[in-house]
Amino acid sequence: MNGTLHAAMDSSCDIVATLRFFIKSGLYRRSHNLFQVAVHKRTKLTLGRGFTVEGKASLHLGDDGGHYPRHTASSLRVGDGAKLILEGNHRILSGHQMDIGPGAEIRFGGGYINHDARISCQHRLTIGRGTIIGEDACIMDSDSHVLVGSAAPRGIEIGEHVWVGGRVMILKNSFLHDGVVVAAGAVVSGEFPPGSLIAGVPARVVRENVEWR
C-alpha cells in the first residue's frame, strides 16, 4: 500500500465517494492521485455532467479536523460544465453546503474554511492563497433573482492572506484585496483596500494598514 493511499484510509475519507468524484470529474484522465480531491464521510455529492477540475493541488471536502470536530453532514452540488481550479491545497471542514452552478468557476488558492460554511457560486468565486474563513460564513455571488434593469453580477474575489471572521456574509460583486481582515458578523458588499479592517452591517473600513498572523 503506497503512502498516499495509507494516509487517506487512516483519515475520515470516504473511499467510494472520493472514487466517484475522481471518475465523474475526469481527474482519472490526468492525475495518478485518487485522493487529490478527498471526500470525507457524511459528505453528499450531486455531480453534473462535463464539469472539470484543474490544477495539481489538493482539496479536502467535509474534513472533520480543526480544534472542535462536529461530525456534521456536508454537501457539494456541482452543475453541468462547472469548473473547479485548485491552485493551492485547501480544506473545507464539515457542515459545509457548497453549490457550484452550471458553467460557474470557483478557484481555491490554498487555505482553510471552517465548519458550517455556506458557499453559492453561480458565476465566479476566487479565494486567494493563505486566506482563512471562519465558522458559519456565507458566501454568495448571486441573489438568485435579478432586479429588472440591474447589471449582471461579476462574482466575488477574495485576495491572498485575508482573514474572514465567523458568521460573516460576503455578497455578490465583493472584492477583498490582499490582507483584509473582516470582523465577525459583518455583511460585506463592495470593494475594500489592501490591509484594511472592516466591520459592521453593512461593512465599513474601521482601520487601515493592519497586519495579522
PLM segments and residue spans:
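Glycine/small-residue-rich pyrophosphate-binding loop that anchors the diphosphate of NDP-sugar donors
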Residues: A104, H123, R154, G166, ...
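Glycine-rich NAD(P)-binding loop of Rossmann-like domains
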Residues: S150-H161
